[in-house]
């Protein structure tokens, strides 16, 4: 395992300690490790050997491999966060990833359901069964509140206040 990969392991451990989503930790680990593997293939094994040209060449390779702009931009943001960690812990003098520009990703308006689609969706569960009632309640909460599926799955009975008509949700941000 290279020294760079050891820094990555420490960074991922710090994300876990900071209660980052397991998906975030996994995705950051996979993506940053892929970059570090690329560095190793280029003969780069220390932070001192890293420069903007290496990072740009890596981003160009991702582009050539068919990665979409949003995926490349995500990699830049992940590398910036990793670099920030290294600087904050006095491992690296300057986060050169901050000087790499992420590709602009056009923002699309979300596709929304029509009233008819919502009615059909909510009518789909068979509410004559306990499972169907549960599924209908799940759909109602998702549609009516806008919570993420991961937030809904994390709810417990103590998070539901029927008297006040409230759900207590701890979200991402």
Q: How should each PLM-predicted stretch be described?
A:
Residues 1-173:
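Conserved catalytic core of the tyrosine transesterase superfamily
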């Amino acid at each position: 395992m290279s020294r760079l990969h050891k820094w990555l392991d420490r960074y991922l451990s710090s994300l876990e300690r900071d209660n980052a989503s397991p998906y975030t930790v996994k995705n950051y680990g996979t993506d940053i490790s892929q970059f570090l593997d690329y560095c190793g293939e280029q003969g780069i094994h220390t932070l001192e050997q890293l420069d903007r040209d290496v990072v740009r060449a890596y981003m160009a390779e991702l582009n050539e491999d068919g990665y979409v702009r949003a995926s490349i931009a995500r990699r830049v943001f992940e590398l910036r966060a990793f670099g920030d960690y290294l600087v904050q812990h006095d491992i690296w003098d300057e986060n050169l990833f901050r000087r790499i520009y992420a590709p602009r990703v056009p923002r699309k308006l979300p596709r929304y359901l029509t009233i008819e689609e919502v009615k059909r969706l909510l009518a789909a569960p068979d509410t004559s069964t306990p499972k169907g009632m549960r599924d209908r309640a799940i759909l109602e909460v998702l549609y009516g509140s806008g919570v993420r599926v991961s937030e809904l799955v994390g709810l417990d009975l103590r998070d539901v206040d029927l008297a006040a008509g409230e759900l207590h949700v701890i979200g991402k941000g």
